[in-house]
């Protein structure tokens, strides 16, 4: 015998598929929405429906936006020779809140995670390498999260960039590749950039070291 209406069950199942939301939380969210006015529910529904319909990926940095290129890549006030590599678009929001970073970004949309079958080919590392090959990038800042997967991703990218520089020629030959740096102190091991405050992120960016 079905106790809950099918529409309620379906919404609970949908919420449960979201990361970090278990069945109990999904149930609480669903029953909360039952008490929300229909106009608010309609606005919520429209926001979800338009989430992908009205957003695009920037062809330069793979951030999300309403236009391609995105507002950051299109800005004349940005230093295009300085590229900060992040795991997700939400990390850009955290770094931008510091007001200190004036370069551009490259969004990987993930991190190397062998336990979940996510390798280098599943995230946008090859696009970063291509960007380095075709551009005039002075510095690459590796701002992946300071956890096991983030460190593995940073190490892999660093190795690929060093190999690329070696193939292009030695520094003395005038074919110097970009400096590769890693965000430094301030971020705890195992922490996520998304949850770091502005002061901590500013210290991490200013204290970055060559990788």
Regions found by a protein language model. Give the residues of each.
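Short Gly/Thr/Asp-enriched flexible loops that form oxyanion-binding sites at enzyme active sites
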Residues: 150-162
């Amino acid at each position: 015998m079905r106790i809950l209406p099918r529409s309620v069950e379906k919404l609970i199942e949908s919420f449960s598929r979201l990361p970090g939301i278990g069945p109990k939380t999904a149930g609480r969210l669903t029953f909360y929405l039952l008490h929300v006015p229909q106009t608010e529910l309609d606005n919520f529904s429209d926001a979800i429906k338009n989430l992908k319909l009205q957003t695009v990926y920037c062809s330069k940095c793979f951030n999300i936006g309403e236009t391609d290129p995105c507002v950051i890549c299109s800005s004349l006030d940005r230093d295009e020779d300085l590229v900060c590599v992040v795991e997700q678009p939400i990390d850009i929001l955290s770094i931008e809140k510091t007001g200190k970073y004036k370069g551009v970004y490259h969004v990987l949309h993930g991190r190397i995670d062998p336990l979940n079958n996510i390798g280098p080919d599943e995230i946008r590392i090859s696009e970063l390498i291509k960007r380095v090959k075709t551009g005039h990038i002075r510095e690459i800042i590796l701002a992946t999260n300071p956890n096991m997967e983030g460190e593995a991703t940073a190490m892999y990218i660093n190795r690929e960039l060093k190999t690329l520089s070696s193939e292009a020629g030695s520094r003395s030959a005038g074919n110097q590749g970009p400096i590769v740096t890693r965000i430094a102190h301030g971020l705890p091991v195992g922490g996520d950039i998304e949850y770091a405050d502005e002061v901590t992120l500013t210290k991490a960016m200013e204290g970055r070291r060559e990788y």
